[in-house]
Regions:
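Short beta-strand/loop motifs in extracellular/secreted proteins, especially
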Residues: 41, 76-78, 117-119
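Generic structural motif
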Residues: 48-50, 64-66, 112-114, 126, ...
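Membrane engagement elements in two modes
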Residues: 1-44
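Short, solvent-exposed, Trp/other aromatic-anchored flexible loops in extracytoplasmic proteins
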Residues: 84-137
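Short coil/turn motifs at beta-sheet boundaries
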Residues: 36-38, 52-54, 71, 100, ...
Length: 139
């Protein structure tokens, strides 16, 4: 499922100017796919469900490279941060385990209630980049 979602994002999507070097956004319905292409790994993150009606918030994640192995446990190198700076660890990774050069899956977090004005996902130590940040405004 996540593979199809990420593939659909690129089909007919219009790029939005990047706010920082190596980061870009692509509109996908209500949410934007954020892309970080620093170093040797391209990382994309797209919110899937971020509303008060769900018990879990899900983010589709894509990791693509041709030069390094993707050995990270994404539940250990990722964190969700709300607009007040509260940090939430993922409760699950739905996708292939560590290894390989192309990984797609879904990071799952417990829903934040009440919903914050903004959230960001930070993913650390992928492809030699200490930290990659992906942010969205919710309200």
């Amino acid at each position: 499922l996540a593979i199809y979602v990420i593939a659909d994002v690129y089909r007919g999507a219009k790029p939005v100017p990047a706010q920082t070097a190596g980061i870009s956004s692509v509109a996908q319905g209500e949410w934007q796919t954020k892309t970080d292409d620093q170093g040797e790994v391209v990382v994309t993150v797209t919110p899937q469900a971020l509303d008060g009606n769900t018990a879990q918030w899900k983010f589709a994640v894509g990791l693509n490279t041709h030069s390094v192995s993707l050995d990270q446990d994404l539940t250990k190198v990722s964190v969700l941060i709300d607009g007040k700076g509260n940090r939430y660890k993922p409760i699950a990774w739905e996708g292939p385990g560590p290894g390989g050069h192309h990984r797609q899956g879904t990071l799952v977090f417990s829903a934040i209630s009440p919903a914050p004005r903004s959230v960001e996902i930070i993913i650390k130590d992928i492809g030699g980049i200490p930290e990659r940040t992906f942010a969205w405004e919710l309200k």
